[in-house]
Swiss-Prot record:
S-adenosyl-L-methionine binds at G108, I127, G128, D129, Y130, V131, L132. PANTHER family: TRNA (GUANINE-N(1)-)-METHYLTRANSFERASE (PTHR46417:SF1). NCBIfam families: PRK00026.1, trmD. It is found in: Cytoplasm. GO terms for cellular component: cytosol. This is tRNA (guanine-N(1)-)-methyltransferase. The lineage of its organism: Bacteria, Bacillati, Bacillota, Bacilli, Lactobacillales.
Length: 239
């Protein structure tokens, strides 16, 4: 996968070049192309923004340098703008994007984009109902969530399949050594060696975590008969 990022602050993307994603870059499993659209200005001072027509506070990013930066790319794939008014990013979107050959992100700053910039994008996406100083951090979050799903990025191929949101539930609790830490013991079922019981425990605990912390995720979920029974047990245990 190739990912292009149009940004005024390419140095902000250094974190994507370390850890598992960094190793993936080195191994050629994905490619990151950072494009500073200030380089596509034509005036002496390299302005990328101007005052808004009709008046108002702040500065608005101009379409010209962004359009020229896009046109400079041999290809773009799906073009994505990060903005507060966009649809909220989620795991399903990450899974869909991970199937693409190429993605291009456009990062905003200041008071946002000239409205005509949005016409250049296929999707406008947000990471939540709050405002940041620019689109770089949301873009990095979305790149991380997407790239980690690519083959060979994570050490354990099963990891992205088993974790939170992959099956529509939050992740079950996990434990490692020691089995007893200051009286806090690992649930016996996890050390029993009974894989069926362990799977049942994990399923129920994932359902419990979702019920307690993200009940909204259960509203649209078609619960199996087994899950309905588990949920009744969970509610009874919590009463």
């Amino acid at each position: 996968m190739k990912i292009n990022v149009l940004t005024l602050f390419p140095d902000m993307f250094t974190p994507l070049q370390v850890s598992m994603l960094g190793r993936g870059l080195e191994d050629g499993k994905w490619d990151l192309n950072l494009v500073n659209f200030r380089d596509f200005t034509t005036d002496v001072h390299h302005h990328v923004d101007d005052t808004p027509y009709g008046g108002g506070a702040g500065m608005v990013l101009q379409i010209m340098p962004i359009k020229k930066a896009l046109d400079s790319l041999p290809s773009t794939g799906k073009v994505i703008i990060t903005a507060p008014q966009g649809k909220t990013f989620n795991e399903q979107m990450a899974q869909d994007w991970a199937k693409e050959d190429e993605l291009t992100f456009i990062c905003g700053h200041y008071e946002g984009f000239d409205q005509r910039v949005y016409d250049l994008a296929d999707e406008t996406v947000s990471i939540g109902d709050y405002v940041l100083t620019g689109g770089e951090l949301p873009t990095m979050s979305m790149i991380d969530a997407t790239v980690r799903l690519l083959p060979g990025i994570l050490g354990n191929a099963a990891s992205p399949v088993e974790e939170s949101f992959s099956h529509g539930l939050l992740e079950y609790p996990q434990y490692t050594r020691p089995a007893d830490f200051e009286g806090q013991k690992v649930p016996e079922v996890l050390t029993s060696g009974n894989h069926q019981k362990i799977a049942e425990w994990r399923h129920k605990e994932a359902l419990k975590a979702t019920y307690l912390h993200r009940p909204d995720m259960l509203e649209d979920r078609q619960l199996t008969n087994e899950e309905k029974k588990m949920l009744e047990e969970i509610k009874s245990e919590l009463d």
